[in-house]
């Protein structure tokens, strides 16, 4: 897997719970790179979903018991250092962040990943699906 493109956050809004919903504007496979800020011991959580509930929260019913979450525990010296997870990919358009001090949309960038294989052909049809 290789990062093939990056997608900035389209919007970010605060929920009444204090968590933030980030919209990247398109569904993708990949992960979120974030600029980390926090005090030692702060736990930042990112949860992922492909759509939202009517109330604007993440729709997670399709995961059943599975977790789609990244967790970062701050050591207090990050000062905006970028971080991305390893050994995981998510299918998502939306991410919910909690535990981060004063997050901004520009702190989050989606990294789209897929196999780095050469394109060997294509097809065009007149049929619209």
Describe these PLM feature segments.
Residues 1-129:
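Extracellular/oxidizing-compartment recognition motifs
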């Amino acid at each position: 897997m290789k990062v093939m493109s990056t997608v900035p956050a389209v919007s970010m809004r605060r929920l009444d719970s204090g968590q933030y919903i980030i919209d990247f504007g398109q569904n993708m496979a990949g992960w979120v790179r974030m600029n980390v800020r926090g005090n030692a011991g702060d736990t930042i959580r990112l949860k992922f979903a492909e759509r939202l509930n009517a109330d604007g929260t993440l729709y997670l019913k399709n995961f059943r018991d599975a977790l789609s979450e990244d967790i970062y525990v701050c050591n207090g010296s990050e000062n905006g250092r970028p971080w991305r997870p390893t050994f995981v990919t998510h299918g998502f358009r939306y991410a919910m962040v909690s535990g981060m001090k004063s997050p901004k949309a520009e702190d989050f960038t989606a990294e789209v990943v897929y196999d780095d294989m050469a394109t060997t052909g294509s097809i065009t049809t007149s049929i619209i699906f």
